[in-house]
Amino acid sequence: MKASELRGKDAAGLNQELSELLKAQFSLRMQKATQQLQNTSQLKKVRKDIARVQTVLTQKANAK
């Protein structure tokens, strides 16, 4: 997901996206802890996506 795509969403949509990403991150962490996760690079991708969403939310909040 690109930051330009995120900038087109409103704050409610971004908060929902953030919530889904945090749930996905938790699930991936549990899979990693129980050694069920095959593709560990997914953790990095989700972490970066969370950072992107939080950055766009902060930018929108500071713009007001």
Curated annotation (Swiss-Prot):
| InterPro entries xref list | Ribosomal_protein_uL29, Ribosomal_uL29, Ribosomal_uL29_CS, Ribosomal_uL29_sf
Q: Tell me which Gene Ontology terms the entry assigns under biological process.
A: translation
Citing just one GO molecular function, the answer is:
structural constituent of ribosome
Keywords, ordered alphabetically: Ribonucleoprotein, Ribosomal protein
- Give the GO cellular component terms, alphabetically: cytosolic large ribosomal subunit
By its UniProt entry, which CDD domains does this protein fall under? Ribosomal_L29_HIP (cd00427)
Under the heading PROSITE patterns, the entry gives: RIBOSOMAL_L29
**What Pfam family is a match, any one?**
Ribosomal_L29
Q: Has keyword DNA repair?
A: no
Q: Which family does it belong to?
A: Belongs to the universal ribosomal protein uL29 family.
- What is the protein named? Large ribosomal subunit protein uL29
Q: Which organism is it from?
A: Cupriavidus necator (strain ATCC 17699 / DSM 428 / KCTC 22496 / NCIMB 10442 / H16 / Stanier 337)
List the taxonomic lineage.
Bacteria, Pseudomonadati, Pseudomonadota, Betaproteobacteria, Burkholderiales
